[in-house]
Amino acid sequence: TPLLVVVPTLEEAGRWTALLELMGWNQASLYPTSEGSPYEPFDPTSEIIWGQLQVLSDLLGDPDASSWAIVATERCLQPHLPPPDALKSTTRTLRKGDEVDLEELGETLAQLGYERVTTIEQEGSWSRRGDIVDIFPVSSELPVRLEFFGEELDKLREFDPASQRSLDAVDALRLTPTGFGPLVADQLRTLMPDGLERLLGDQATEQLLDGGTPEGMRRLMGLAWEQPASLLDYIPDTTTIVIDERRHGVAHGQQWLAHVEEHHLEMAAEAGLNESERE
């Protein structure tokens, strides 16, 4: 049975993850979360977002998995994610034998937020040399080298970014966006809700309308979707949920919510929103 362990702090989450690995779970994953307010005008660090995408990608790729465990703080229960269908619709899987147009693949990678470089060194980048494409997915621990025979994907191998040496062969490569911002931006471009320009400012609004992704899009997730998701929306219905140190977790959550409410009022006042618009 899949397992979700909810703990008060990230430090305890790290200890629980290590303990579950020692207990023999095939896959024990730490789901990182931010302690910052969701109304900050900037997104959480890449490490947090990429860590979340790694777990979410695994869940979307194998929704019926029964041998994994996830450990997270109570923050994972708060709405902070796009709905699963929205993330799944932008996720692409490449398998051996697939017919792939390399020019279209490059366009797809750009849309997902990947940066084209000469040599792969970190997550979120890709390169191409003839019929060889290297991609470092943000949802993977190692980059993958794709070798094509014409338009047919002939080989997929992980490789060491330091030495560029090929490692183990893999059956498939799952590509997610490099962050949640592009999904929010796409949805807002479709909806164009009232008050968006006032919230973003002229420059960011112009960037959005030009097809870009302004910084801090994640704070507008509640405008993009009527009900943003939490980790609970991604895990299987059969998941066993364990809450450790419940009182400590509740106290920690209440303290964070008080900070968030205060910050929300400050941001609304700065934006010049009236009482009804602040709700």
Residue ranges and their predicted role:
Residues 1-279:
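ASCE RecA-like P-loop NTPase motor cores
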